[in-house]
Amino acid sequence: MSEMTLNAAEQPIDELVGWVKQHDFSLNLTTERLAFLIAIAVLSNERFDEELGEGELHDAFAIVTRLFDETGEASAFRANNAINEMVKQRLISRFVSEITDGASIYRLSPLAIGITDYYVRHREFSRLRLSIQLSMVADEMAKAIEAAQKGGTPGHWKKNVYGVLKYSVGEIFDQIDLNQRVMDEQQQSVKQQIADLLNKDWREAINNCEALLSETSSTLRELQDTLQAASDELQTQILDIQEIVYGDPELEFIEEALFGLQMKLDRITSWGQQAIDLWIGYDRHVHKFIRTAIDMDKNRAFSSRLRQSIKDYFDMPWYLTFADAERLSDLRDEALVLRDDEVTGQVPMEVEYEEFQQVNDELSERIGDMLKAHKEQGTPIDLSVVLRDYLAQHPYTHHFDLARIIVDQAVRLGYSESDYQAIQPDWKAINEFGAKVQANVIDRY
């Protein structure tokens, strides 16, 4: 979520609606008007001062109208109407300059820049752009860490740490998030291309579909590798600043900024793996469709073409590529035994030989009793308290296995309303060895 969205979310909806109504905000861009706005943006970028005269706007309108000949001729009257519409919708700003003898000059508004920037600059999402943005973030974070280590007055923290985190690092994170959304659109475009190919002639489309699928999969994996490599460094930098400001009430605003950056970093990182997982599912779906189409081919066109290719092999040689991977063996055991590492001290016999199912049943009964009490009395269940109390009764080497079982039982028997409101809980300690858990209280049966 961008900083602007966060600020807007803090205001009541009725107040925002009233503000929009009071200023009479509205947008109505037909395809021709959008093309005109993009033409203005392109011409503005070619100018040093990014200012255009009325004659230049008329020229841009004439260029657009030639491509939209069905809408009418490019008269000065229609051009002026289009310009006035843009001004009314706050897409361009009009100024009267005495230097130009009262002639008007025009500049794009921030709203128009946002619209045209999407269409002009964000049509491609490349690994190079992502790498540069991540490198810029790392440099800005390094500046913030250096300033934090020096310390100083509240003004120093506000300007050299908070300002860098919020207005530099945060905005670059927002740009990365925007670019990821562009990549989402590109995936949808590839899916549409594949659908069009399969609908026209699936036999001829197989090779093209495979190329589109492989290219997109490769791009996603490269982007994820780039994200993963950079996110580790960024995570370390965020933790370094958190360690410096921890426990200082005067620097609470720094912690809030870091929390916002942490959420953005988590979202950016998780997007890559999620996009890969979704694309793998789509890839399988397409291949399943092609296999089904081959099996249901009444005319046996595919098999006929294959036989003909074999027959003509010596005249037109070809290569056959096939995959013959070894089958993976499933070594999972449904009745896992708890780890039996050697520990200092005496381990109770009932725990040392306790099996997974026994522990599972005991925890299920314990959490079930808590949920029953919650149902009758409305008392929420703090999973961190449950973990801390239960793990304190067992050796340290068993803590990981036991914690996994407790969480598994908890999510089966109850859930938290906060999870559906996207509320991120705090980390809480669950043992004396530094282990922590992040979970909302269970308040729904």
Swiss-Prot record:
Pfam families: KicB (PF03882), MukF_C (PF17193), MukF_M (PF17192). Its main location: cytoplasm. One of its GO terms (cellular component) is cytoplasm. SUPFAM superfamilies: MukF C-terminal domain-like (SSF140570), Winged helix' DNA-binding domain (SSF46785). The keyword Transit peptide does not apply. The keyword Calcium applies. Residues 213-241 are annotated as: Leucine-zipper. Keywords: Calcium, Cell cycle, Cell division, Chromosome partition, Cytoplasm, DNA condensation. It is found in: Cytoplasm, Nucleoid. It comes from the Bacteria. One of its GO terms (molecular function) is calcium ion binding. InterPro entries: Chromosome_partition_MukF (IPR005582), MukF_C (IPR033441), MukF_C_sf (IPR038198), MukF_M (IPR033440), MukF_M_sp (IPR036141), MukF_WHTH (IPR033439), WH-like_DNA-bd_sf (IPR036388), WH_DNA-bd_sf (IPR036390). Belongs to the MukF family. Interacts, and probably forms a ternary complex, with MukE and MukB via its C-terminal region. The complex formation is stimulated by calcium or magnesium. It is required for an interaction between MukE and MukB. This is Chromosome partition protein MukF. The lineage of its organism: Bacteria, Pseudomonadati, Pseudomonadota, Gammaproteobacteria, Vibrionales. The gene is mukF.
